Amino acid sequence: MSSVFDEYEQLLAAQTRPNGAHGGGEKGSTLKVDVPVFTLNSDDPEDRWNFAVFCLRIAVSEDANKPLRQGALISLLCSHSQVMRNHVALAGKQNEATLAVLEIDGFANGMPQFNNRSGVSEERAQRFAMIAGSLPRACSNGTPFVTAGAEDDAPEDITDTLERILSIQAQVWVTVAKAMTAYETADESETRRINKYMQQGRVQKKYILYPVCRSTIQLTIRQSLAVRIFLVSELKRGRNTAGGTSTYYNLVGDVDSYIRNTGLTAFFLTLKYGINTKTSALALSSLSGDIQKMKQLMRLYRMKGDNAPYMTLLGDSDQMSFAPAEYAQLYSFAMGMASVLDKGTGKYQFARDFMSTSFWRLGVEYAQAQGSSINEDMAAELKLTPAARRGLAAAAQRVSEETSSIDMPTQQVGVLTGLSEGGSQALQGGSNRSQGQPEAGDGETQFLDLMRAVANSMREAPNSAQGTPQSGPPPTPGPSQDNDTDWGY
């Protein structure tokens, strides 16, 4: 029978092989889109700033078509480069689009001066300027920046220009994090991360973009695979760049921590709390199929290479193999473990229709039972004596019991139900508590009595200040309308 199991394992390996591994797919069968990309041949600080603003305006313009927005966004992300043409050439290494490089020598009164090699006529240059002037209506001050007049302020030197450009690029990179996942709920996280970069000095408050501009840029990223391929290449370069050597790629590497493995949270949480905890529940025959599936998925992830963390951003079809429905029982068990061991998972909505309630409860039971267990490998490395192990286990057990006796309804395990027994008892008062917790109930009763006494004293204070209690309702704030002297006669 061993041959049957070997064949089954090979079958799973064949099913989880990455798409395109055989090399028989067609290339170049799809029509390529011509994407115009702008480059600047000048290192003048003012020209470089005008170029960045020009690309930003086109990227969020209402009159620009999709290829023009995509090219302007790529140009904006390359505006820090000393030789922009070489940087743009990296974006052209793809089969999705053809990049048409349009060289700009400088700007005169806000008008781009195109190089003769670009073949851009004067009429087309004026059309580009008109498109750049068509901003969304939400930009009330006529600029993409919340601060009016920010783009008209000439930079002092190249350092000032780079700081401004980096402020814009940081906001663009922040929108990438949730561009392919929960983009409808990205406002809060984007604001939080932009505030973080403002505190670090990477983003200047003066050059904060309107939210509608960030939403437009995020929509362009969602719609264009060519832009996302360029973004992934920049993320890879940021990871390969040594820290502290490039201001721009230090920022890209920092943003990479938010983008890596997006859409694969369920897979990695299952590995962390379902596999890495090494509980005895993994010996259940009902979990053997899911464990075998996880083994093949880990192998698939390694075979994807450098693109594995960015499967969601690239829209890779192999990402569907990592969906938690493929290993539902092990996922349910891991989420039960995580709900007890890691309170941070409370923000992750891991409840699914296919979740097994029994395995989730099993995970909760194992997590609670292992709260006072000792990792033998770590204990051996620390050279703990038997007495030290017993003392550590007793201390952990005592702390877990004390923690469980405290009523904390917001941290109770109630993901599937939304309620907890401790929370309902807290609403009913200390008299309805279980008999096993008399001290906690008495403490809560004393606290409620104290709060009632404070409230009564606060209500009695105004009456004592007036000398006699009021027999009627309290007066209405403001001048009395029943007094003739207050009518102005």
From Swiss-Prot:
GO terms for biological process: negative stranded viral RNA transcription. It is found in: Virion; Host cytoplasm. Residues 421-489 are annotated as: Disordered. One of its GO terms (molecular function) is structural molecule activity. Keywords: Capsid protein, Helical capsid protein, Host cytoplasm, Ribonucleoprotein, RNA-binding, Viral nucleoprotein, Virion. Residues 403-489 are annotated as: Ntail. RNA binds at K178, R193, Y258, Y348, R352. InterPro entries: Paramyx_ncap (IPR002021). Residues 422-437 have a biased composition (Polar residues). GO terms for cellular component: helical viral capsid; host cell cytoplasm; ribonucleoprotein complex; viral nucleocapsid. Residues 1-402 are annotated as: Ncore. Residues 1-375 are annotated as: P protein-binding. Pfam families: Paramyxo_ncap (PF00973). Its main location: virion. Forms the helical nucleocapsid (NC) in a ratio of 1 N per 6 ribonucleotides, protecting the genome from nucleases. The encapsidated genomic RNA serves as template for transcription and replication; encapsidation by N is coupled to RNA synthesis. Forms the encapsidation complex with the phosphoprotein protein P. Before encapsidation, the newly synthesized free N protein, so-called N0, is chaperoned by P. Belongs to the paramyxoviruses nucleocapsid family. Ncore is globular and carries the regions required for self-assembly and RNA-binding. Ntail is an intrinsically disordered monomeric domain in the C-terminus. Homomultimer; forms the nucleocapsid. Binds to the viral genomic RNA. N0 interacts with the phosphoprotein (via N-terminus); this interaction allows P to chaperon N0 to avoid N polymerization before encapsidation. Interacts as N-RNA template with the phosphoprotein (via C-terminus); this interaction positions the polymerase on the template. This is Nucleoprotein. It comes from Avian paramyxovirus 1 (NDV).
